[in-house]
Amino acid sequence: MYDNLKSLGITNPEEIDRYSLRQEANNDILKIYFQKDKGEFFAKSVKFKYPRQRKTVVADGVGQGYKEVQEISPNLRYIIDELDQICQRDRSEVDLKRKILDDLRHLESVVTNKISEIEADLEKLTRK
């Protein structure tokens, strides 16, 4: 699993926290950030540089002109797919945790309101 990341020398892909991708001249720069350990100020990161792939395509629908375009390297595309799998998994876990906490807070308020209602009913009974 995560063969493309392992080919970059990343032995523990599960420790990846996030990544960034930017274009610089004719290259794409991929920076991968790892989870911080306790007591660390900065997350460890590694940087990779990929030359952009050049293609010649028809410039207009008539087919009389051509232009050169650059696009992301196919290898980098596969690496980004793996990074997205890792980072999306982490986001969905965070979203689930947030949902559970929200549900607990809602349940807490419902129970608190119900307890107040029951106590008010008991108070009415004891006054009679």
UniProtKB/Swiss-Prot annotation:
InterPro entries: UPF0325
Intrachain disulfide bonds: none
Pfam families: DUF3461 (PF11944)
Residues making up the signal peptide according to the UniProt record: none
Family membership noted in the UniProt record: Belongs to the UPF0325 family.
Record-linked HAMAP family: UPF0325
Protein name: UPF0325 protein YaeH
The organism of origin for this protein: Escherichia coli O1:K1 / APEC
